[in-house]
Regions:
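Short, conserved aromatic-histidine micro-motifs
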Residues: 628-648
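Short active-site loop/helix that positions an aromatic residue
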Residues: 602-604, 615-630
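Conserved small-residue
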Residues: 1-64, 69, 73-75, 79-81, ...
Length: 702
């Protein structure tokens, strides 16, 4: 347990639930076909492993125990990927040491004709299974009894959903089930019709963006869902949404899944002292590379770009929280950034006493007086995802109280922000780095590797047994109290493994640098000028090319980065925190504040709903970024919007399939990496692939 600001975060609250793949819902006939299919595949896999063993023995120069790896003292160059295959290698060596000769092993290999026959049987059995699943589309699916076992239990973190369902932290809970999809036919059946387990009916609930990427979804016991449905949806039913013309189904599922985010209960969330206002949006003039998605033509042009500066960001008074954090409530998500908007209003009143600057209009046209109503939190329209389905903010507040809805928080700024690591994507776009520059960038990592063998403090740091670690486990506590344990054989062996791991990470581009991950926050002073002083294009406190970072107050130039980093997303900006007392007064958190006159959000492709930036102060990286990105401008292209549909089981299934089959982020980013590895990379191809990658992300996260 740890305390951050006004909240206590208990990371140990977890709940055990069942997880089943689609095979766990098969009928007896389908199961028989599946077992036959697995047996055939096992023959193929066993043959592949046997061939690998024979090749390994031949490389050793013979067969039998005397040729096994354990009988030679020859020193070989370590394989940098060996730790990833350690278990497989040990198992293979064990089989190789049984004394069988190469000829004996060859005698067990499948012939070409046998392989052909088995592969033919695999195709036929697979087609028969698919046909049987299609024939059974209209049946009620049941979880097979043998699947309800300890092998199919996972743990999930505490969330609004688990709290509403009053889930146990000690027993296995049967109210939620996570389903892993292998055959779409079975998934279609249970998404549309539900399924039964132990006599109880379960219905499809939703899937988070992360679950969609891994082809998973959550089902819920129907009787339990009916009890908590209004608390989870703040009284907004599918019937009401359909009466308003429907919704983008994937957005709906993503927003419904917000209650399943790992959060800590915000017990005294002041719903009565919260309002929702229109976002702060302006046109920002600048040069962009415009991409036409239909023709892939790229045109550099000067234009006005519409930017929603507060996209996903709201404000909370310092009296309620000293730290920025992310909020979760029914249909509400985003960042709450600390900002004294009450003080802003008072100072505006002093400058112009004839105007009541405390008046602000919400998204429904209702005027509010910040002081008279004691407003402590200002949300923005972009944070209130289903705002159009409520007639007023008062209706949402009333239903919030009526149905016992709750809010949660997550990802609060820590008291101490650890240094971050560079990654290969950020490194590969600095295409002209010299060997000397690379050596400087690797210096911290190399120093750590050297000191791990001799410096006690470095050893403790690597183990996480330092004051900077918030939650020490028993092993770390032991090391902290008695560092002499570092000489223990177990510790020394673990240290060697850690050293190897750090070396492998460094080879893959994960390098220690002077940098930290910070919340991205817009110029909230400019937002208040817009909301309370009614300025269309407020000046704010930051000019184009400027940022504010209290964390790096002494560093006047920063490289602002964000993942995924695919196309030279190095935004080198001037940090003006130290030179401007007004900025120190208003931007008093550990986030990084960006200007409302800057196209930085288009360069880094971020919004402000809790996105973080890797803010780097390394002078070598900054110099290389300035050199490599001198002619880089933001990519700009229209994002397609899916239409609204009625919420039905059919629509839910179609939405899930569209997300599952909508593209593979990894394939695109890997293709981009291959392009950057060329001596003369095709930069235009990278730009187009980045656009396609963002289209895929948009489909996945709705």
């Amino acid at each position: 347990m740890m305390t951050l600001g006004v909240f206590t975060i208990n990371l140990e609250i977890q709940h055990s639930v069942y997880t089943f793949d689609t095979a766990c819902f098969y009928t007896d006939e389908e199961t028989e076909l599946d077992h036959r299919l697995q047996a055939l595949r096992k023959q193929i896999n066993d043959d592949k492993h046997l061939r690998s063993e024979i090749i390994a023995l031949e490389k050793k120069g013979g067969g039998g125990a005397e040729a096994s790896p354990s009988s030679t003292n020859q020193k070989t160059t370590p394989d940098p990927r060996a730790h990833l295959r350690g278990k497989q290698k040990r198992a293979r060596r064990k089989r190789m040491d049984t004394g069988d000769s190469i000829d004996e092993k060859r005698s067990h290999l499948l012939t070409a004709q046998e392989l052909k026959e088995i592969n033919k049987s695999i195709r036929e059995t697979k087609n028969a299974l698919k046909k049987k699943i299609d024939e059974n589309m209209g049946i009620d699916r049941h979880v097979r009894q043998e699947a309800i076992s300890p092998y199919n239990i996972i743990s999930i973190f505490d969330s609004n959903l688990t709290r509403c369902l009053k889930m146990s932290t000690t027993d296995v809970n049967d109210t939620l089930v996570v389903v892993k999809v292998y055959y779409f036919g079975v998934a279609e059946n249970i998404i549309k019709r539900g399924f039964y387990m132990n006599g109880e009916h379960y219905v499809f609930f939703s899937a988070s963006a992360g679950q969609i990427r891994t082809k998973k979804f959550v089902a819920i016991k129907e009787s339990a869902y009916l009890e908590v449905m209004d608390a989870l949806t703040c009284g907004l039913s599918a019937e009401t949404i359909n009466a308003h013309g429907g919704v983008n189904i994937n957005k709906y599922l993503a927003y419904l899944a917000l209650c399943n985010s790992a959060t800590t209960l915000w017990a005294k969330f002041p719903i009565e002292k919260t309002i929702v206002v229109d976002d702060f949006e302006t046109m920002v003039h600048g040069t962009v590379d415009h991409i036409d998605p239909s023709t892939y033509t790229i045109t550099r042009q000067e234009t006005d770009v519409p930017i929603t500066h507060t996209d996903g960001c709201g404000m909370i008074l310092p009296s309620l929280s000293k730290k920025n954090f992310m909020l979760r409530a029914p249909w509400v998500k985003g960042l709450l950034a600390v900002f004294p908007f009450d003080q802003f209003i008072r100072e505006a009143d002093q400058r112009d006493p004839l105007v009541n600057h405390a008046l602000i209009t919400d998204i429904y046209g209702q005027q509010h007086d910040v002081f008279k109503e004691g407003i402590q939190i200002i949300l923005t329209k972009s944070q209130f995802k289903m705002w159009k389905y409520y007639s007023s903010w008062s209706e949402y507040q009333r239903k919030f109280r009526q149905y016992g809805c709750t809010a949660g928080k997550c990802n609060e700024e820590p008291e101490r922000i650890d240094n971050a690591k560079f990654n290969y994507q950020m490194l590969q776009t600095l295409t002209d780095l010299t060997d000397e520059e690379l050596s400087k960038i690797c210096e911290k990592t190399n120093r750590k590797l050297r000191d791990m063998a001799s410096d006690r403090q470095t050893m403790l740091q690597v183990f996480g047994a330092t004051k900077k670690t918030y939650r020490l486990n028993a092993f770390q506590k032991s090391l902290a109290y008695y560092p002499e344990l570092l000489q223990d054989p177990y510790c020394r062996a673990t240290l060697r493994d850690l050293k190897n791991s750090i070396e492998l990470q460094a080879v893959a581009g994960r390098l220690d640098i002077d940098g930290k991950y910070l919340f991205l926050i817009p110029d909230l002073y400019a937002a208040c000028q817009h909301w309370f002083c009614h300025e269309e294009t407020p000046r704010g406190l930051l000019k184009n090319g400027e940022v504010s970072s209290r964390t790096f107050a002494k560093h006047h130039k920063l490289d602002v980065l964000r993942s995924p980093h695919l196309y030279k997303e190095h935004a080198v900006r001037r940090n003006v925190y130290e030179e401007n007392p007004e900025i120190q007064k208003w931007f008093a958190t550990d986030g990084i504040y960006t200007s409302s006159f800057d196209l930085i959000s288009k360069i880094l492709q971020f919004d402000n709903d809790g996105d973080k930036s890797l803010v780097c102060t390394d002078p070598t990286i900054i110099a290389a970024a300035e050199r490599n990105c001198a002619d880089v401008v933001p990519l700009y292209y229209p994002m397609a919007k899916a239409g609204a549909v009625r919420i039905t089981p059919e629509a839910k299934y179609n939405g899930m399939v569209a997300a599952w089959t909508g593209g593979n982020i990894g394939e695109i980013s890997n293709a981009i990496t291959k392009i950057w590895s060329n001596p003369e990379p095709d930069v235009d191809a990278v730009k187009i692939l980045v656009m396609e990658n963002n289209f895929v992300i948009d489909r996945l996260v709705a």
